[in-house]
């Protein structure tokens, strides 16, 4: 995947993006852009609208206000260019497929669901597995892998798709230290190749490691900007609804 040439449209553009269910806003007024090679952390408490916003970017839920554009188009028109990595524990671990077969699923948005994967597709899938350190587990049944390994397989599936935009939902939840390091390295490679990354996460330390911008949400946008100037105790307090302080290791603690 070649890097995006300078001067093009942002990979992701949100303009007052709003989603409501039964007239009740779930997330509203989100503004921001994500450029090629950039990574943005979505941070907020449970129920803040992070997953809903990701679903809206995927074109799975309609906006009730504002706009979302992916590569200058509506999300539905750009689906082949967008990959999504859910939490590993949202998938059925008993589904009888191998790690390689899961990764091959990432090729279907490019080749279509009717065509069978060819040699080039299998090579892309094998390369993606190698990038997350699981080349030797290609034939292992997905359900026999550890939680961290399953999360790496799901990222490999996204890598095989060669996306321009990668969306992740809590990718580091419950993963071991090795998997965490391999996930961070793989995300860095994707960004270097020109992909934009948006991830929902509760881990502020990992947000600092993986992202250069942050979007703070609690049903509406609290802040959007460089992580060093936006992830402040004041804005975090506004996001989480209580007095907080940020320790040097990126951990939020309540003020006495």
Regions flagged by a language model, labelled:
Residues 229-256:
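ABC ATPase nucleotide-binding domains
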Residues 162:
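Conserved catalytic motifs of ABC-family nucleotide-binding domains
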